[in-house]
Every structure is written in structure tokens, then in C-alpha cells.
Amino acid sequence: MINNTSIKPEQLERVRKLMNEHVLDSVVVGYEHIIDGLELPDVDDRHVLAAAIQGNAETIVTFNLKDFPNAYLDRYDIRAVHPDEFLSDLYSIDAGSILKAAQQHINSLKNPPFTATEYLDCLQKQKLPKFVSFLRPMSSLIKLA
């Protein structure tokens, strides 16, 4: 993300701060020594796998599945999962919590604010069609602040 010129440095810093504040154990340290021993189709992705190994992660959630082949990740008991599949699985496990999280997320969006329909349309554009197919019938349950 740091090399993505469409994202302003301030936005990246805001996301980093929010992740660190709200996601327990979101910062993994001490993984650097693992990087050189890893082989992935894109060498610039090795730090992601190294952090997953160091952090004892079971899953790497990424749109970039081609650069995280499960055949290679299997040796580390890690799997790569598309965000649409990951979110859909979470919904199947606990739909109520996912609806609550969606509601909190929608209500946190202020500039511009989103209706439930606009929010779901945005998720659809972000390549999350299966997840949206679960949420759309429940959109009337999403209360806006």
C-alpha cells in the first residue's frame, strides 16, 4: 500500500493507527530474519508470509491469491483466502456480529456518509459479491445513526 500513489500518506497513517488501536496483536515484530528463506512468486510479498509465520497466523487474507500459493503455504500451516470468502465464512459463523460490525462501519463513514444500499454497492465494487449477497437481504436490519 505504501507504493500506491492513489493513497495519501496521511490516509495510510490513519489506517495504521486505527488498526493498531482496534485490532489486538495487529503488529508483528521479529519476522525479518525469516524473509530471505521464503520463496513466493513475488519476492516483495515475502514479508507478509514471514509476519504470518512469526505471528502464528492461520490465514493470510488477500486479493492477491496468485502470489500466495496454498501449495507452498501448506508447509507453514497457513492458507491464503480471498477477502470475499473470508468475510462470507465469518458471516456464516456469526451473522449477528457481522451485521453489527457492518452497521458500525457504515456509521463511522462521515465524509461522505453512506446509506446501507450505497455501502453494499461499494463492497460489491470492491470484489466482495458473495459477502454482499449475504448482507443485501439483511440491509433493512442495518440501522443508520
Role assignments for model-derived ranges:
Residues M1-Y31, H105-K127:
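PIN-domain endoribonuclease scaffold, especially VapC-family toxins
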Residues R14-N20, I35, G55, F68-P69, ...:
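Short, functional N-terminal and low-complexity linear motifs
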Residues D45-R79:
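Acidic, metal-binding active-site segment of PIN/NYN-like and related structure-specific nucleases
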Residues L65-A145:
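Acidic, PIN/NYN-like endoribonuclease modules and their adjacent C-terminal/linker elements
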Residues L24-T59, I93-D94, P113, Q126-A145:
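Active-site neighborhoods of divalent-metal-dependent phosphate/nucleic-acid chemistry enzymes
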